[in-house]
């Protein structure tokens, strides 16, 4: 057997040991999300996820968004109508926006990030975090693929980001609005398919007094907003909450440009910062 399949199998065994058994078709349906049937992820999961909903993958809609409407997040403590129009347009018409990105790693986290990116992310073409500014110097291309159910309604969207210089996949995520058990309103749910599993993040939406928009995956209990690893092994599925915490702050600067500050933390320590400049491409 080749080394890389052994490594991936060992990883699933690790998450089985660290996690708890779940029933994604029943009690833990909030953790049901797309997986990859092969080691290299790319966009291979899209058709299978559409089939789960009895629908299709829509690659033709102009101005497709990660969410059909930001109103899906409305509930106690959040009103989409209070969000700045540019922010709302980005989420509802993501494919009509161009993205420039800059990244910076904390010195303590860089070696681990380099190992993960080189030996995992780049190999499977998923979660291949940029390690150096030159990695994204020529920019990233993005594509939004809408997943529709049998009635034609958008139930999720794939946001696929590739390096313009090489065409290699950096991120391949499934975006939707999803309500956690007992929650009064929906969170933004992002699932990154992996072979026989996925990484999922539930982000709590917040609107600030200036109309800027914040998404946070804080520490907490199992079943609350945060990050989870799900892995299938031996005919069962396991899930573990992981100490990865993110925040996204989308705001309009004093020149009218939409920007995002993205902070990735492990436990409470900042591991990586990214900054995005978002401009209409249409």
Ranges and model annotations:
Residues 18-275, 279:
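Soluble ligand-binding/transfer domains with enclosed cavities or grooves
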Residues 2-9, 13:
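Cationic, amphipathic, low-complexity segments that mediate targeting or membrane/lipid association
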